[in-house]
């Protein structure tokens, strides 16, 4: 099991690294399990030192975190983090929703402290090509993130709580002041480029595919 991903920059920018270090991880699978168990920290440090020399890591001032899980099915998880920013782009396709079921969002965030982010967002509803923009703030506390977003031009406020149950599972609760609506969702990450979210939006349940 091998995974290299980031929640700080779009994963598509790391494709070259992902394929390169897949080869490095294949070399580890050829080692005896007992050896990997004894030297796990040294092997993690070796991978970290190699990653720190990569242009993508240096140019974007990224911070890799590596976890090796010894065993017959050896696992290598590489998270590429940043202390400075969070940038992501997502597309949404909603199955079982009557309107606004195709959309996309861009998020550009700047970390102003280890636990605090200010950001701007741009969202487009593809059904009627309607643009929405917002500025906001997030406070990160443990596995949770508390966000406030002021959306324009509609002028309403969003309040959002997200909680990571595990690297793959996430809960979301969101309140939209404009129509006084609450939204509850459970999200599962299938792989780096695809997630699925089951959403209850106040009057309807629907499945959201996120790419």
What are these language model-derived features?
Residues 1-211:
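Beta-stranded membrane pore/translocator domains
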């Amino acid at each position: 099991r091998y995974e290299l991903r980031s929640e700080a920059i779009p994963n598509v920018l790391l494709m070259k690294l992902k394929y390169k270090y897949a080869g490095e991880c294949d070399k580890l699978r050829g080692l005896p399990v007992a050896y990997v168990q004894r030297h796990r920290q040294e092997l993690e440090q070796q991978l970290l030192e190699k990653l720190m020399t990569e242009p993508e890591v240096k140019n974007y001032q990224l911070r890799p975190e590596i976890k090796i899980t010894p065993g017959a099915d050896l696992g290598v998880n590489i998270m590429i983090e940043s202390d400075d920013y969070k940038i992501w782009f997502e597309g949404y396709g909603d199955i079982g929703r009557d309107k606004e079921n195709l959309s996309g969002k861009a998020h550009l965030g700047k970390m102003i402290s280890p636990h605090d982010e200010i950001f701007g967002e741009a969202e487009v509803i593809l059904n009627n090509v309607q643009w929405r923009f917002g500025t906001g703030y997030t406070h990160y506390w443990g596995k949770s993130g508390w966000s406030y977003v002021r959306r324009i031009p509609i002028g309403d406020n969003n309040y959002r709580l997200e909680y990571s149950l595990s690297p793959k599972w996430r809960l979301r609760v969101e309140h939209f002041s404009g129509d006084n609506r609450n939204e509850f969702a459970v999200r599962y990450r299938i792989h780096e480029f695809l997630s699925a979210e089951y959403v209850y939006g106040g009057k309807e349940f629907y499945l959201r595919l996120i790419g």
